[in-house]
Each structure stands twice: as structure tokens, then as C-alpha cells.
Amino acid sequence: MRRRLRLRREALLTLLLGATLGLLLYAQQEGAAPTTSAPRAQGRAAPGPTPGLRVFQAPDTGAAPPAYEGDTPEPPTPTGPFDFGRYLRAKDQRRFPLLINQPHKCQGNGAFPRGPDLLIAVKSVAADFERRQAVRQTWGAEGRVQGALVRRVFLLGVPRGTGTVAGEAEAGTQTHWSALLRAESRAYADILLWAFDDTFFNLTLKEIHFLAWASDYCPDVRFVFKGDADVFVHVGNLLEFLAPRDPAQDLLAGDVIVQARPIRVRASKYYIPEAVYGLPAYPAYAGGGGFVLSGATLRRLAGACAQVELFPIDDVFLGMCLQRLRLTPEPHPAFRTFGIPRPSAAPHLHTFDPCFYRELVVVHGLSAADIWLMWHLLHGPNGPACARPWPVPAGPFQWGP
């Protein structure tokens, strides 16, 4: 009898504990539910975005930014993808020696005594030789294009883990990567290499070092296009856009992003803690995949960026430098640093089509093979067979669900 009573008490206690645990889990789940913005008032239409501008908000909760084709998802870690402690300790170190230079890149000649009309500067990494070759053989080819002189440089840092001590670098330590890059520089005369680790959060160092280099070695350049190695650029369309522009006036045009909020999700590639940036939104900036600026703006930015505290996201940092100069980046709908979105009415539409690309200036996110293929589709002997200009899908960038 006593044993039965004890068993009943234990069973009842187990049920009570289970119910209590269930209530606690339910309450925790409700408390962690993502918050949403306040509902819009009935009968009032949402304000439309300014044409050419991208208005998007970073997710506040555990949702990471949408993955694009080719992205490799990384499991979240409790410490985040980046060592901000190390970054904060070293962020004031902003001068690194130039290991490979191209001092004559912007020298003039008989036909072009002032040097190039357009300098193309492409961010790259040491191992990405295939993409550099694709750029050299297609849209980044040097020479005359529509009467303009075009020159090209690639911007690199030292591959991580190979040793970036200034003394070692200046002593010319012969490592595998340095030998290959020096051979590539001798062959193509377009490599700029600085002695900082070539990491995502050091792209800001690449930005300020290039601005300083271009101000010193290309003082008379009219315009500069700066972009990634995985973009396709229609240089003819770019030069048409620049033709009526005065290089002595301020200009920075591209895929302009406004009202972007810092991402506070540790698992995100773009995670920024409040200790690094405490304001609710970034200043307006042009997507780093590709933008164009005048020679006058380049020289002003070189001075402004030398006075702005370094920030680990390079295109946002450039927006901070523009803000210091009280300049506003100019939005251009033909700069597509988020690729070409498929219209909702035609979800199966193939956007990798020369009839789309012939209307654009920059498209981001292409492989080396895609760059080569699109270039030859557009510039082949017959050209693309397009009955009429195709409408390019437009609209503000939206984070996926």
C-alpha cells in the first residue's frame, strides 16, 4: 500500500515538473519571438523608394542575410566570424609598405599627354589569377575604347599566413606567392601589392592605400572605376555615362544604398557590434561591387579618408568619408551590385542574357567563365539578336524571408 502511494506521488511530481518545464519553454519562446515593425495605418500607401536608391534594413534577429549562388554557408560560432578585439587593437595601424608598384601606369604619351581617361582598379586576392585573366581579356583590357585611354590595376594584400612583418617584406622574402605575383607583375604590369593581410575586414586598408597611390601616381586621371573581380562591366556604357561629365567636378556614382542598419547578428559576415558602431544607420554609400568617381573626388577622398577612423566594411567606410566631405553618392540604376533580380511576374526568366547586359554598366556576382562568355556574346561579330531594349528589372533590394 505504501509503495503504491509513493509511486503515485512520484508520478504526480513528474507530471507537475513536466508541465512546469513546458510552460517555461513556451514563455521563453514567446519572449524570443522576433519583433516586427509597427503596422501601417489603414488606407495609407507606403512611401515609394527614390528611383535608383536601394533602401534596405538589416535583420535584427537570428536571420542572416540571404545567401546568393556560390555562397558557402558557415555554421554560427559563439564568438562571431571576426576577432574584433584584435581589430580594435590594430585599427590605428594604417600605413603599410607597397611591395609591388606600377609607378608608370598613368604616364602620358603623344596622343594622351595627361594620361588615362579611365583607370580601372579591381580588388583581387593572390590566388584569384583566373578572375584577373578574365578581366584582362575582356572588359578590363587596356587601350583605346571609344576614343578614351583605359588603364588597369589590381589591388592585393598579402595572403594570410605568409607573414606580413614589414622587415621580412622589405627584405624580399622569397615565398611561393610572392614569386608568382612578381612574375605576374612583370608579365602584365598591373599588380599593386601592399604588406597587410588580405582579409575581408582589411578591404578598408586596400581602399585608403589605393586612394593615396592614385593621388600620387595618377594626379591627372579623369575618372576611376573601382570594383570587384567578379563583376561584369560594360565599359562602353560607362564611358557614355561619363562623356558629358566634368572630371574637375565631384562625382561618385553607383548602386547607392541608404538607411542601411548595422547587422548585430554574430553569425553574419557583416556583423558589427555596438562598441564599434553605435548609431542606428550607416550614411549613404555606393555598393563596393563597382562604382565610378571623378579625379577631383578621388583626390578629395584621399585626404578625407586619412582623417576618418577606420571601419571594417570598406564601402560603408567610403560613405563615412563622403559624409565628411558633405558629398552625396549619385544613384545609377545600371549599376547592379546585387545582380539582376528576376521579376516576380516571370520567376523563371533567364537573366544571364546579353539583351539584359547591353543596357547595364555593372553586374556583380559572375564567375570567370561567365565574364568571358558574356563579353564575347556582347562583342562577337554579330552581337546579340535583341529585337528591342529589354526592360531591366528594377526596385529596392529586399532581405529574403
UniProtKB/Swiss-Prot annotation:
Residues 32-401 are lumenal. It is an enzyme of class 2 (transferase). Keywords: Glycosyltransferase, Golgi apparatus, Membrane, Signal-anchor, Transferase, Transmembrane, Transmembrane helix. The chain crosses the membrane at residues 11-31. Its EC number is 2.4.1.-. One of its GO terms (biological process) is poly-N-acetyllactosamine biosynthetic process. It is a single-pass type II membrane protein. Residues 38-47 have a biased composition (Low complexity). Its main location: Golgi. GO terms for molecular function: hexosyltransferase activity; UDP-glycosyltransferase activity. The keyword Membrane applies. InterPro entries: Glyco_trans_31 (IPR002659). Residues 1-10 are cytoplasmic. It is found in: Golgi apparatus membrane. Residues 33-85 are annotated as: Disordered. One of its GO terms (cellular component) is Golgi membrane. It comes from the Eukaryota. Belongs to the glycosyltransferase 31 family. PANTHER family: BETA-1,3-N-ACETYLGLUCOSAMINYLTRANSFERASE, UDP-GLCNAC:BETAGAL BETA-1,3-N-ACETYLGLUCOSAMINYLTRANSFERASE 9. This is UDP-GlcNAc:betaGal beta-1,3-N-acetylglucosaminyltransferase 9. It comes from Bos taurus (Bovine). The lineage of its organism: Eukaryota, Metazoa, Chordata, Craniata, Vertebrata. The gene is B3GNT9.
